[in-house]
Amino acid sequence: MFRRALRLGLGPGLPYRGLRTRKGGFTLDWDAKVSDFKKKVDSILPGKKYEVLYDTSHLPPEQADVVIIGGGILGLSVAFWLKKLESRRGAIRVLVVEQDHTYSRASSTGPSVGGIWQQFSVPENVQLSLFSINFLRNINEYLAVVDAPPVELQFNPSGCLLLASEKDAATLENNVKMQRQEGAKVCLMSPEQLQTKFPWINVEGVALASYGLEDEGWFDAWSLLQGLRRKVQSMGVFFCQGEVTRFITSSTPMKTPTGEHVVLRRINNVHVKMDKSLEYQPVECAVVINAAGAWSGKIAELAGVGKGLPGTLQGTKLPVEPRKRYVHLWHCPQGPGLETPLVADISGVYFRREGLGSNYLGGCSPTEEEEPDPTNLNVDHDFFQNKVWPHLVQRVPSFKTLEVQSAWAGYYDYNTFDQNGVVGPHPLVVNMYFATGFSGRGLQHAPGIGRAVAEIMLEGHFKTIDMSPFLFTRFYLGEKLQEYNIL
């Protein structure tokens, strides 16, 4: 019984069928009174305009139904679907809090090469990709704004190619069978077939390959982010540049069916510290969405998540932390050319074509022992030389003459438990929901994740895609949802 209750989420607050803060239109009335007062002062006092009251236009609203922490792809997607699914226009007051409006530290766009593919080992990830590709192909049906230019994602449907050794061939074959059952168009290729289709590949060590026949490739992540931001602003979403530093909560002690004593918490206020200032604004709210990417673990701690005895539900942490990843851009006129898909090698190295000028993007995730310092975004150029380039040359001999043009670093919102995302409510902090921990896949899965969070928040259950395996409670229950196809 307890396991079933855990999976569904403990405590009151689900579903939120009518999101409310305090009754009345206090904020609107107050703003109108302040405006009238300023006009009277200006008409009485001579000379230059006199500002009697302190300007608070840079502050977030004092009340919101939903506060979304994190204004990246995932946070914006949640905001979009909340407004898209609201019962009437303006029914849900949404505030997005983002600390870095340049998105230089964003988990979904910084280290991403913009890839989208259906070749995963977890069925729900395949379903998310299929949902996303439909969203992206019809992007302007979703994100069009009156009198604004259309969103141009520059989608390149060149496919994704996964290579497997003899050891992993059976797993790859089973994955492809599952992917086809979910509706993905994926084929298996022998080394001979691989060599025929892509003659520039050295097939040494390759026992089997899988290739996406349609709806796979890459797109411009920045265009999607800006398109979502523009759209949700047009839908009435509020934005604030600041940092969440504190939650004001209320608590209720209770006992679980197994006899464990727990404390249910509810977030009543979010404290937002203004950018480059000592100022802060408390925001009264009904729901908090934790979409803070690589820093979502710290946000969860502020709400008391994991602040209990180890091995208990109260002491179960959100296992998401920042992991630094590099992306390298190189030029190689003798390279594979225009027919290059997104390639994932046996070694873990990946690459794709970038534009039409013989440029390529790629990289590789380090081993646990080689994890770089995440406190800065400095690029270790020796990593490419020692860990990436040798594998590139082994698989594509023409890359021997490549010249690195540039490189940058970004953060993965890395889930150390099973490298899969966390979606839905926390069982004890009953009005905190998660959209984080996708370990580099947040960009391509954002449309489906955003809808899933909006559905469970508004309806009390997942509808479009059943994301129950992604609930927070799996960390306490020890039920890993291991995804193996991670770039």
Swiss-Prot record:
<dbReference type="InterPro" id="IPR006076">
    <property type="entry name" value="FAD-dep_OxRdtase"/>
</dbReference>
<protein>
    <recommendedName>
        <fullName>FAD-dependent oxidoreductase domain-containing protein 1</fullName>
        <ecNumber>1.-.-.-</ecNumber>
    </recommendedName>
</protein>
<dbReference type="GO" id="GO:0032981">
    <property type="term" value="P:mitochondrial respiratory chain complex I assembly"/>
</dbReference>
<dbReference type="GO" id="GO:0005739">
    <property type="term" value="C:mitochondrion"/>
</dbReference>
<comment type="function">
    <text>Required for the assembly of the mitochondrial membrane respiratory chain NADH dehydrogenase (Complex I). Involved in mid-late stages of complex I assembly.</text>
</comment>
<keyword id="KW-0274">FAD</keyword>
<dbReference type="GO" id="GO:0005743">
    <property type="term" value="C:mitochondrial inner membrane"/>
</dbReference>
<keyword id="KW-0679">Respiratory chain</keyword>
<dbReference type="InterPro" id="IPR036188">
    <property type="entry name" value="FAD/NAD-bd_sf"/>
</dbReference>
<keyword id="KW-1133">Transmembrane helix</keyword>
<keyword id="KW-0560">Oxidoreductase</keyword>
<keyword id="KW-0249">Electron transport</keyword>
<dbReference type="GO" id="GO:0016491">
    <property type="term" value="F:oxidoreductase activity"/>
</dbReference>
<dbReference type="Pfam" id="PF01266">
    <property type="entry name" value="DAO"/>
</dbReference>
<keyword id="KW-0812">Transmembrane</keyword>
<keyword id="KW-0813">Transport</keyword>
<keyword id="KW-0285">Flavoprotein</keyword>
<keyword id="KW-0472">Membrane</keyword>
<keyword id="KW-0496">Mitochondrion</keyword>
<feature type="transmembrane region" description="Helical">
    <location>
        <begin position="62"/>
        <end position="82"/>
    </location>
</feature>
<comment type="subunit">
    <text>Associates with components of the mitochondrial respiratory chain complex I.</text>
</comment>
<keyword id="KW-0999">Mitochondrion inner membrane</keyword>
